[in-house]
UniProtKB/Swiss-Prot annotation:
Belongs to the RecF family. This is DNA replication and repair protein RecF. One of its GO terms (biological process) is SOS response. The gene is recF. InterPro entries: DNA-binding_RecF, DNA-binding_RecF_CS, P-loop_NTPase, RecF/RecN/SMC_N, RecF_2. The lineage of its organism: Bacteria, Bacillati, Bacillota, Bacilli, Lactobacillales. Keywords: ATP-binding, Cytoplasm, DNA damage, DNA repair, DNA replication, DNA-binding, Nucleotide-binding, SOS response. The keyword DNA-binding applies. It comes from Streptococcus equi subsp. zooepidemicus (strain H70).
Length: 369
């Protein structure tokens, strides 16, 4: 798939902007704080209905305006699709081919994206919530049912925690009802995550072998808060461990086990990547991002769109070369933001170059020397 055009109204520093893209490589160039990342963020938001930079929709609306919109035309193997998101103080509206979507799980997945931004370099050493969000975003695009299961799980979890905080004595019968619902949805979430991580690890290992010239082995471990050896055991093990922690949950007023406590651990040559060098971290994340692209292609039969937000300057020449080689091999539509073409000397000649300046964007196709 590839996005053919994007239209913004009152988004960030864009009052009104439109751009038509090529199915290959598209580069946004301009000084800092001109709107390059904002435009890339809009593509990301149109796909996953969230920003990678802020949790507040208000931050996305142009100064003094009350609403904003993002719309785009997507070319998929199955045909052309029109996507639109409207944001206002009343909430969000998502549309596919002008039809309003009642649930996020009905919308997300229509356009798949893989984002590589500087903050992704914190994925290894950052908090577990970052790694859970990483799984949620990818799985939500690949398997819409995952979002439904996760939403139901979070709803029951919120109910259970509210109950634990409100009572001075446990009602075992009522808690058992909540436990049954929590385990039903939670075991599905964990099964989805387990299968995803196993597949992702295989792809990431291949890419890391290429990037490290065969000198390093990358592995990824799914660390569920519920102990189990086989996928078939997840439901019963979750139920048993949840019941065993009733008193603990009552005293601490929260739920101690479940997918909301899950984590991922990365290993390089069988050693925890937390202790790896900065260069190894960059290679790991680069491998992970290209593995996301490969896996989405495998599991859906269509290409995702790759968004590279100012990451070329974060990579040395060798890793830049490896990234561009991987992009060329995967043959996916790619967007790059940069302040200079200096880091992009190895780009192919046939690119679409867009100049971004003070909330305006204009196409200027050039040949790179």
């Amino acid at each position: 798939m590839w996005i053919k055009e994007l239209n913004l109204t009152h988004y960030r520093n864009y009052q009104q902007a439109s751009a038509a893209f090529s199915p290959g490589l598209n580069v946004f160039i301009g000084d800092n704080a001109q709107g390059k990342t904002n435009f890339l963020e809009a593509i990301y938001f149109l796909s996953v209905t969230r920003s990678h930079r802020t949790k507040s929709d208000k931050d996305l609306i142009y100064f003094d305006e009350r609403d904003c919109s993002i719309s785009g035309t997507l070319e998929r193997l199955s045909g052309r699709v029109q996507l639109e998101i409207l944001l206002s103080d009343k909430g969000r509206i998502t549309k596919i081919n002008t039809l309003k979507q009642a649930k996020l799980s009905d919308y997300i997945g229509a356009m798949m994206v893989v984002l590589f931004a500087p903050e992704d370099l914190q994925l290894v050493k950052g908090s577990p919530s970052l790694r859970r969000k990483f799984m949620d975003i990818d799985l939500g695009q690949i398997k819409p049912v995952y979002l439904s299961d996760l939403s139901h799980y979070n709803h029951v979890l919120k109910q259970r925690n509210a109950y634990l905080k409100s009572v001075h004595q446990l009602d075992s019968d009522f808690l058992s009802v909540l436990d049954e619902q929590l385990v039903t949805y939670g075991s599905r979430v964990m099964a989805h995550r387990l299968a995803f991580v196993q597949s992702l690890a295989k792809e990431a290992s291949k890419h890391h072998q290429a990037i490290s010239n065969g000198l390093e082995k990358l592995s990824i471990s799914y660390q569920a808060s519920v102990s189990f050896e086989h996928q078939q055991e997840i439901y019963q093990q979750f139920m048993d461990q949840l019941k065993a922690t009733h008193q603990r949950d009552f005293l601490r007023k929260n739920t101690g086990v479940g997918p909301h406590r899950d984590d991922l651990v990365f290993y390089i040559n069988d050693m925890n990547a937390n202790f790896a060098s900065q260069g190894q971290h960059r290679s790991l994340i680069l491998s992970l991002k290209m593995a996301e692209v490969s896996l989405m292609k495998q599991l859906t039969g269509d290409n995702p769109i790759l968004l590279l937000d100012d990451v070329m300057s974060e990579l040395d020449n060798i890793r830049q070369t490896k990234l561009l080689e991987a992009v060329k091999k995967e043959n996916v539509q790619t967007f790059i933001t940069t302040t200079s073409l200096e880091h992009l000397s190895q780009l192919p000649k046939d690119i679409s170059l867009f100049k971004v300046n003070k909330g305006t964007i204009a196409l200027d196709s050039v040949m790179i020397d």
